[in-house]
A protein has these predicted regions:
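Short, Lys/Arg-enriched N-terminal segments with co-localized hydrophobic residues
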Residues: 1-6
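Short, mixed-charge low-complexity intrinsically disordered segments
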Residues: 44, 48-75
């Protein structure tokens, strides 16, 4: 559909612990011009976040990163 090409998407990321079942508050990963751009940024940001958290902490606390791309209403 033609209208979807102009829709923008906001990247929402979250770090969670499978050990505790808790998650940190959602983080705004910015607005992207397409679903593809948002999903690609989410994938890259997930890898970067894992690297920043570090292997030891990720393993110890069973951390994982999730993301979603929500449409920006009115954009």
């Amino acid at each position: 559909p033609k209208g979807l090409s102009t829709m923008k998407f906001i990247l929402i990321m979250k770090i969670c612990s499978a050990l505790s079942g808790n998650c940190l508050p959602e983080h705004n990963g910015g607005v992207h011009n397409s679903w593809y751009d948002c999903a690609a940024a989410g994938s890259l940001n997930t890898l970067n976040a894992m690297a920043e958290l570090g292997k030891e902490d990720v393993n110890k606390r069973k951390l994982f990163v999730t993301f979603k791309c929500d449409p920006v209403l009115g954009a």
